[in-house]
Amino acid sequence: MDPHQSPADNAASPTKSVKATTKNSSTNNNVNSNNSNNNSNHDILNFNDNYTTILQHLANDHPNILREKGGSQQQQHQQQQQQQQQQQQQQQQQSLDTLLHHYQSLLSKSDNAIAFDDNVSNSADHNGSNSNNNNNNNDISSPGNLMGSCNQCRLKKTKCNYFPDLGNCLECETSRTKCTFSIAPNYLKRTSSGANNNMPTSSNSKRMKNFEDYSNRLPSSMLYRHQQQQQQQQQQQRIQYPRSSFFVGPASVFDLNLTKHVRLDNVDQIQLSKTLSLRKVSPTAQFILQDDFDTTLHSKQEYEVDLVENLVHPHGHLLVEIFFKLIHPFLPILHERVFLEKYSRSYRELTAPLLASIYSLALQYWDFHPALLGFPKPDVTAQLNNIALETFYARVGRPKLSIIQTGLLILQCRSECHNNWVLCSSVVALAEELGLGVECNDWKLPKWEKDLRKRLAWAVWLMDKWCALNEGRQSHLILGRNWMIKLLNFDDFPLNSPTILNSLQNDQSGSSPSSSNDVKNHQIAFGNLPIFNINPTLEDFKNGTLMFQQMVSLSIILGEIMDTFYTQGSMTINKSIEQVLKLAKPLQLKLREWYHSLPKNLSMSYATPQKLNSNSTLTLAYFATEITLHRKIICALNPQTPKELVQVCRTAARTRLVAAIEFIRDLKNEHINAFWYNCSTGNLMLIGTFAALLYVTSATKEEAMIFRDYVRNYTWVLKIGSKYFDKLSNALNNMHLLFAQIPGLLTDEPVVVSPNSNINSVNPQRSGVQSQIPIQFNVGSPAMTEQGSPLNQWKNLPQEILQQLNSFPNGTTSTTTPVNPTSRQTQLESQGSPAINSANNNSNNTPLPFAPNKSSKKTSQSSPNVTPSHMSRHPPSNTSSPRVNSSTNVNSNTQMNASPLTSINETRQESGDAADEKTAGRERTANEESSTELKDDNPNSNQETSATGNQTIKMNDDKNVTINTRETPL
């Protein structure tokens, strides 16, 4: 079919009826041809078709309309006309509708009608008139010819070239808009200013008079039906139905080499069928566009979005404001200006799942908006989530960017659910359908759409990686294979947020309902109730977009860790500890580089009282990534692993665990009530899982009890915080399901060391948990023989000697180990740990307390260090703990700047627990002796320390393993 041919040309029913009628009355037409000169309506009848026969059939239904004086002649033909009426009743009805349609379009065709009126000869050939009529029928079939130029072309004053098969003119198709027709332009021209146009011609007046007379004689039902059809057509023209897009891959049947030989239109598009078109956006990328939206789906969509709006009415606009202030800066996946423009016109221009997910996320901050303090929070979050999920799956078959935005927001709403993998996979599949994994810089798209596609692509990547980690699945996206997007930069984000900018302007004028003055007034009215300032600045908006960039960068490192160690193939290959350490080393360096490159405004120390701070969600993600890497290292240890290597690996793992637990303990209200990514609950569970893993892999009972205390204190932190933080509550409940099944972990059952964990593990220092064994110690001490750790020898000492050792003051014991100056300098230069920095933030809020260990008295004989100092219920102190030996005591600056990437050499003092102080002497003495034994002063030792700080360990099979103790145990 010719692409420029109207679909109405193929609709044969109206045309056939007219032709059939023409054959039956051809004799009458020839007879009346001589009288056509005297017919005042001759120009009208010849304009579109031979309407004389149609009028005759119309007269059959209404004989009074065209009644003449020759009544006897009418009676002769009455029986014949009645028979024709019964046979062609349906065809006549269609002809009447066509006649009405043609008469209505006469006004827009007046210019052509005038030409016909002036040039048509009285002796015109009948065949020639029929050919003109057929051409006019083709022109009338398209809306562009019915109404003239479309609104867009009329405003631009350009020629409107309408293509019926495309449904658009050339200008509208280029600008990707829908042709709309409101008022006939030719009629506007006639009524516009001008002397000639203001004076009606005789032919125009005749046409108008005949049209009015004829329309007055028509039945009222026909006019009503025609008016109703006209209103429906105008309503459909106003609605711009979006088309679904499908990216055409290189292996598709629509091969690029074939489409190169296809003739495209001016917008690089070809119409494949009535509902399908192929569009090339670049020499190497093309899409299939499908018209799969109709009035039925539109009506259903309006019903669904009305249902969503009624659940939160009349507070929908405030929830949208909350979303773009507190959530969207950290998840910038919407085009804010376009969204607000549509929402300001009507919420019906948005889809139900998108609006429901936005309302659901904003309801979390209902109590923080001053304008909503006097209203009860609607209990509709579950309803909104269900509507969003159901309507989302109903639209999966029609891929659009808005569907991906909806899926990402639903994943954020379902952050506490543990079965999001199917939903996440659907979002990834939709991203592949739209080609988000392909670089679009050279595509023929506007810049705002390119930027939006890049942000959406990396948001899908982020969701896929963290969901795969938390649910133990294989990630679908592989960087460099099916994901070829460049990293985000500052130019890919909007310069500002219209919502935040408008709020700041209202604050300056004092007209905002949530201005700072109102916040102060509410704070005075409610006493000491903490009222947070939810009005972010433009700097906060930039920090939010910067956090999104850093989260994407961290997820790339996480993706490498998952692909290296947690795929089915890698788990069967990378089993030996040597191979694992070799592969883990570059990943550890990338993590360190990422942490050191964090700007100050994303650190835990960057906080303002009574202002929400979301930096904690980024720090938690960093700890989860570190733990994910060290989980593999711990699982790779086996009984054949050298003792020194086991000691280094487990010490590094213990360091990460302690830092993560302290980080959660020191969270403040500004962090808890701020935005958290959907992976945060799973990351909280990873910390507890890692502690339990170290517990079950402990080689000795004493070490197992230490990690058991870590697990118990961490669960106590979650229990205290769960009263006002749902993520802590959900993490605690999910952890308890498994931990309760492990003997001795949460109960006072005897600790049983698993026979499979027959690892020559180092016995952890019996001082406070903060006094870690530094990574800079000299490993491979000859005292660590097959007979076990020298700490076991202290059990045979008399009780009197132990009491005398307890009386020694801290730091006076002679058995000290000097710290390597090079290693100490490296420590001083290292960046502070996020956990340590979080403990020293300047804030008025009290950190979460730790619970006292209820089983400390029962197990004090077998494990002196039951309640570590860092787990104390009291606030941490900056003074050195008496439990820490002098070999691990570094100055206070070193303690405050120790990075979790090297070691945590923190020392804190308990300030109110006399029972724990009684056991401090025994622990201190054991630690001092352990430090002395770990020190290697024997030049004949089987280890070598290079000038750069690298230590080479000679293994049993004469293989050397080099460990860089200046940087990391890896």
Swiss-Prot record:
GO terms for biological process: positive regulation of gamma-aminobutyric acid catabolic process; positive regulation of transcription by RNA polymerase II; positive regulation of urea catabolic process; RNA polymerase II preinitiation complex assembly. The modification Phosphoserine is found at residue 833. SUPFAM superfamilies: Zn2/Cys6 DNA-binding domain. It is found in: Nucleus. Residues 150-179 bind DNA. GO terms for molecular function: DNA binding; DNA-binding transcription factor activity, RNA polymerase II-specific; transcription coactivator activity; zinc ion binding. Coiled coil: none annotated. Residues 15-41, 73-94, 121-140, 807-823, 875-894 have a biased composition (Low complexity). CDD domains: fungal_TF_MHR, GAL4. Keywords: Activator, DNA-binding, Metal-binding, Nucleus, Phosphoprotein, Transcription, Transcription regulation, Zinc. Present with 704 molecules/cell in log phase SD medium. This is Transcriptional activator protein DAL81.
